[in-house]
Amino acid sequence: MQITEQSSLYDDLEKKPVREILEDINREDQKVALAVQKAIPQIEQLVNLIVPRMKQGGRIFYMGAGTSGRLGVLDASEIPPTFGMPPTWIIGLIAGGDTALRNPVEGAEDDMNRGWEELTGYHINDKDTVIGIAASGTTPYVIAVSYTHLTLPTTPYV
């Protein structure tokens, strides 16, 4: 079993000077831009795959647990007001449902079957794209996205 919550720069925060904490956070934030820069070729491929599907009525599904799931739901909820798209085009699913947006739902991320059931409840089709979001890459609820490829081989999943 992989542990996602482990020792980090943020252990013993109460013992660190504020300046050190802020510098640590800033250093970590800088890693994000570099990671995105390295992934631009893969991101471009994904966008080029998704856009034609959406033009044919396809949807994007984000599936995540914990903070990763919350960020997927947040992103999906920002699409309608920001870009004027219908809320049914990009859908965020989080292990534990809406309750998990504000409160931890322990164990929900370990239920792969539940992830698959929630996804199939939307009647996914070959125009849809399913994107799993997991910091560890091993969250069972999120791994359910791989079932889409077995059931609908032309439906991309990430």
Model-derived segments and spans:
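Cofactor-/ligand-binding subdomain signature composed of acidic, glycine-rich
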Residues: 1-35
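A short, well-structured juxtamembrane/interface segment
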Residues: 38-52
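Active-site cofactor/substrate anionic-group-binding motifs, chiefly glycine-
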Residues: 51, 56-98
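A short, small-residue-rich loop immediately preceding and capping a beta-strand
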Residues: 58-67, 126-138
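Short glycine/serine/threonine-rich phosphate/pyrophosphate-binding segments
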Residues: 68-74, 136-144
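Glycine-rich oxoanion-binding loops at beta->alpha junctions
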Residues: 80, 84-130
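Conserved small/polar residues in nucleotide/adenosyl-binding loops
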Residues: 148-154
